[in-house]
Amino acid sequence: MDPVAEAKKYITGNGVRQDCTRGLRLLKGPSDEGNPKAMIEMGALYSAGLCTPRDLPTAYRWFALALRKDPNNQSVQADLEKLWGEMTQPERQLAIRLSQ
């Protein structure tokens, strides 16, 4: 099974008991290995505060990394622009540092 789909099952509790810890662990590996789909999911989780504390700079980081892997992804570009508009100046500075 696709590791991102497997992780999402645990994060949402779809067909299995919700287990954020397991879902995040399943998602982190592919994200760290450069899987853009996993990176987008990580960004979405941090942006929404689902299974993680809401952290816009970290969400921005994951979306920015995903966009580097898939530069034509307009949805990710839109997510980045939306996050940028929601962040304070200190959060933006942190987001830039985290994304380098």
Predicted ranges, named:
Residues 75-100:
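Terminal, low-structured helical/coil segments at or just beyond the last alpha-helical repeat
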Residues 1-6, 10-14, 19, 32-36, ...:
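Short helix-capping/linker turns of helical repeat alpha-solenoids
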Residues 3-12, 26, 41-48, 77-83:
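Hydrophobic face of amphipathic alpha-helices that form TPR/SEL1-like repeat modules
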Residues 64-68:
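A short, solvent-exposed beta-edge/loop patch
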